[in-house]
Every structure is written in C-alpha cells, then in structure tokens.
Amino acid sequence: MFYGVWSLITACRNKYDAITLYEDVANMDRTERRSSIIAVKDANRYLLYRDLGWGCDFFPNHATASSTDEDVRQLTTYFADEFGIPAKDFTLSHICVKDSEKPSAEHDGEVRYYEYTLYRASVTVMPDAWRSTEFHVGAKDCRWMTLDEMLADPVINKINHDVVAMVRDNL
C-alpha cells in the first residue's frame, strides 16, 4: 500500500506530457542496419570489393538474416553467386557480433547504428580469377589487401575503421 501511494505522488510530481513523450520516442529512433561480414584470407591479405554506395573497398557483406542458420544459408548463396566461387569450395564460421555507431557515407554523414556479424570463409579451392591482386568477377571489382594497407588507406580507415578493427581483433 505504501508503494502505491508513493508511486501516485511521484507520478503527480513528474508529469509525463506530450513533449516528454515525443522526446523519448525521438531518442529511441535508432536507424539500425544489420550486416554480416565475410572475411576471406589468403596468406596475410583479405578479399575486398569496391562498394559503390560507400565509395570504398569493403569486405563481402550481406544483410543479416533473423536466424544464424538462415544467415549462413543466405551468405553462402550470396558469396557463391556474387564472387564466382562454388558453395562446395568454402565454409563459413561464425566469429562474433559487434555494434557500431558512425556517420553513414550513403546518407550524407547521418549517424547510423550498425550491428556487424563476422564470419570467416575458409576456402578449400581458390578460383583462378582470384589469383591476381586485383580482379573482376561478375559485377564486382575485387582486390586483396592486408589489414595494414586497409588502415593506411584514408577512405577505408575513415568509413570502416570499426569493421577493419573487428576483423583484426577477432581473426
């Protein structure tokens, strides 16, 4: 009973009005994007492709599915289709999930919230097209870069330092 009276008095003192409600809703409006990242390594370099929307080279990625099994299935199809490697020639291993808040290059610097799921792709048979430092497969311009090269690249470092650091720290 005491708790009920105390709650009533507190509610009367701290009125919750339309302005406060609007501010609370505005603060909750976090535009999130969930992306699954595929890290493919050959010796000490990682596979990147030219992401036209972001204007920089980036790891292969796809929108994250709701379940891990579905995510792996979708990523396998995406990676095989878009990068010209048969699904039987690689396996994906879940590594970690990381949240990030940063300005979006695609949305004029608007701060966006990201959740990245990192996968390692273990390639058993390297496609011939992938044997060059830079190559074109399907509609993708691809290249191999070391983590140090990525961090030294001003565009990659500015736009995706968080993702490069996640790969560096977890693989």
Predicted regions and their residues:
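Acidic, metal-coordinating catalytic segment for phosphate/diphosphate chemistry
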Residues: 4-35
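A short coil-to-beta-strand element that immediately follows conserved catalytic motifs
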Residues: 86-98
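Conserved Nudix-box catalytic region and its N-terminal flanking loop in Nudix hydrolases
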Residues: 20-22, 29, 42-86
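Nudix hydrolase/Nudix homology domain
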Residues: 1-5, 24-26, 53-67, 126-171
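Active-site-adjacent beta-strand/loop module that shapes the phosphate/pyrophosphate-binding cleft
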Residues: 98-132
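A structural signal for well-ordered alpha-helical scaffolds and beta->alpha junctions
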Residues: 72-76, 112, 116, 156, ...
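A short catalytic or substrate-binding loop motif that flags glycine-/basic-rich loops and adjacent residues
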Residues: 28-33, 41, 111-113
